[in-house]
C-alpha cells in the first residue's frame, strides 16, 4: 500500500486556524499550536458571553428603572407590581429607555402604578 502524504490537507487546516487567529497578541497569531488553543478558547468565550450579555443588559435595565422609580417615590419591585396591577404590559428594556430618554412618560407610568397600588 502506498504512503499517503497529507500535506495539502494539513496546510489548509492550519491556514484556517491561523486565519481565525488573525489579530491575536504575540505568538498566538503565528504559532499553530498556541493559535489553535486560543481560537478554541475564543469560541468558548463567545458562546458563554452571548448568554452573559442577556443577563448583563437585564441588570442594567433594572438598575436604570430602579433609579428612576426612586426619583418618583417607589422602589423597583413596587413599581413593577403596580404596573402589573394596572395591567400595563411593558418590558424592562422599554421602561429603561423611557427612564433615560422620556422622564415625563416614565413619571406618568409611575403615577399609574402608585394608583393601582393604593386601590
From Swiss-Prot:
PROSITE patterns, per the entry: RIBOSOMAL_L20 (PS00937)
Gene Ontology molecular-function annotations: rRNA binding; structural constituent of ribosome
One of the record's GO cellular component terms: ribosome
Highest taxon above the source species: Bacteria
BP-aspect Gene Ontology terms: ribosomal large subunit assembly; translation
UniProt keyword list: Ribonucleoprotein, Ribosomal protein, RNA-binding, rRNA-binding
Pfam families: Ribosomal_L20
Family indicated by similarity: Belongs to the bacterial ribosomal protein bL20 family.
Function field: Binds directly to 23S ribosomal RNA and is necessary for the in vitro assembly process of the 50S ribosomal subunit. It is not involved in the protein synthesizing functions of that subunit.
NCBIfam families: rplT_bact
Protein name (record): Large ribosomal subunit protein bL20
Species per Swiss-Prot/TrEMBL record: Enterococcus faecalis (strain ATCC 700802 / V583)
Organism phylogeny: Bacteria, Bacillati, Bacillota, Bacilli, Lactobacillales
Gene: rplT
Amino acid at each position: 500500500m502506498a504512503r499517503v502524504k497529507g500535506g495539502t490537507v494539513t496546510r489548509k487546516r492550519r491556514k484556517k486556524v491561523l486565519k481565525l487567529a488573525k489579530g491575536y497578541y504575540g505568538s498566538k497569531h503565528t504559532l499553530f499550536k498556541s493559535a489553535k488553543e486560543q481560537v478554541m478558547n475564543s469560541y468558548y468565550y463567545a458562546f458563554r458571553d452571548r448568554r452573559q450579555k442577556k443577563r448583563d443588559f437585564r441588570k442594567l435595565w433594572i438598575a436604570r428603572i430602579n433609579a428612576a422609580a426612586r426619583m418618583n417615590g417607589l422602589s423597583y419591585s413596587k413599581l413593577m407590581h403596580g404596573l402589573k396591577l394596572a395591567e400595563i404590559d411593558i418590558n424592562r428594556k422599554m421602561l429603561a429607555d423611557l427612564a433615560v430618554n422620556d422622564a415625563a412618560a416614565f413619571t406618568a407610568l409611575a403615577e399609574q402604578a402608585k394608583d393601582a397600588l393604593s386601590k
